[in-house]
């Protein structure tokens, strides 16, 4: 009988330690109200809230480790009305947050109905800008090629003009040499003619003086 009582007390203590049936204790994190239960059934003070699931059961039972007259327990525990009040405030806060998000989204969308249309419009604008830049680059390349062709034509024209001037100068030089050779021959012929005329004049002079 004593063993049975001892077994029941140990079993009850084990249940009190391993199962948390207390109220929804608020855990304030980033201004939001969270309620957790321990998945493995072994409640500890250092349980990670991120690994605990949300508890939807509403209870006003106090924690096993806290007495009924504990001032800290009365401050930490919330009634059902208070919890619904807090939840209502959270809903209002969430509504305001969603309203701000919708305003920021509408501002980001720039008058479009959805992100898909906005992204399609942006992609069209980017495509148009890319096509315009590609067209401008093509025009610049064609103008550059035209400038190169004009420069090459001007250079070839200058080369042709220079070669033409060289040929013309060479022909003029040859003609001048030919003329100078002809003038030299004429000069020699003229000198011979003058000498012959001088000889004849001297002979005529001597003949005239003798008479």
Swiss-Prot record:
**Residues annotated as signal peptide:** 1-18
Write one Gene Ontology MF term.
protein homodimerization activity
User: Mainly localized where?
Assistant: secreted
Q: Which UniProt keywords apply?
A: Disulfide bond, Endoplasmic reticulum, Glycoprotein, Golgi apparatus, Secreted, Signal
Q: Where in the cell is it found?
A: Secreted; Golgi apparatus; Endoplasmic reticulum
Cellular component GO terms, alphabetical: endoplasmic reticulum; extracellular region; Golgi apparatus
**What positions does the record give for glycosylation?**
30
Q: How does it assemble?
A: Homodimer; disulfide-linked. Seems to also exist as monomers.
Which PANTHER family does the entry mention?
A: FIN BUD INITIATION FACTOR FIBIN, FIN BUD INITIATION FACTOR HOMOLOG
What's this protein's family per the entry?
Answer: Belongs to the FIBIN family.
- Indicate what this protein is called per its UniProt record: Fin bud initiation factor homolog
Tell me the organism.
Homo sapiens
The encoding gene: FIBIN
């Amino acid at each position: 009988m004593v063993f049975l009582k001892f077994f029941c007390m140990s079993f009850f203590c084990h249940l009190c330690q391993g199962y948390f049936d207390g109220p929804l204790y608020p855990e304030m994190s980033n201004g939001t109200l969270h309620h957790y239960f321990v998945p493995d059934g072994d409640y500890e003070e250092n349980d990670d809230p991120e690994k605990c699931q949300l508890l939807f059961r509403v209870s006003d039972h106090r924690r096993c480790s806290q007495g009924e007259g504990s001032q800290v327990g009365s401050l930490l525990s919330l009634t059902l009305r208070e919890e619904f009040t807090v939840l209502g405030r959270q809903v209002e806060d969430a509504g305001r947050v969603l309203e701000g998000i919708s305003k920021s989204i509408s501002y980001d969308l720039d008058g479009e109905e959805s992100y898909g249309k906005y992204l399609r419009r942006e992609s069209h604008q980017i495509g148009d800008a890319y096509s315009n830049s590609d067209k401008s680059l093509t025009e610049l390349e064609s103008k550059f090629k035209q400038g190169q062709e004009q420069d090459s034509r001007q250079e070839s024209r200058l080369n042709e003009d220079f070669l033409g001037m060289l040929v013309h100068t060479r022909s003029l030089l040859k003609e001048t040499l030919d003329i100078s050779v002809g003038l030299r021959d004429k000069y020699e012929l003229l000198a011979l003619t003058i000498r012959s005329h001088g000889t004849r004049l001297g002979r005529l002079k001597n003949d005239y003086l003798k008479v």
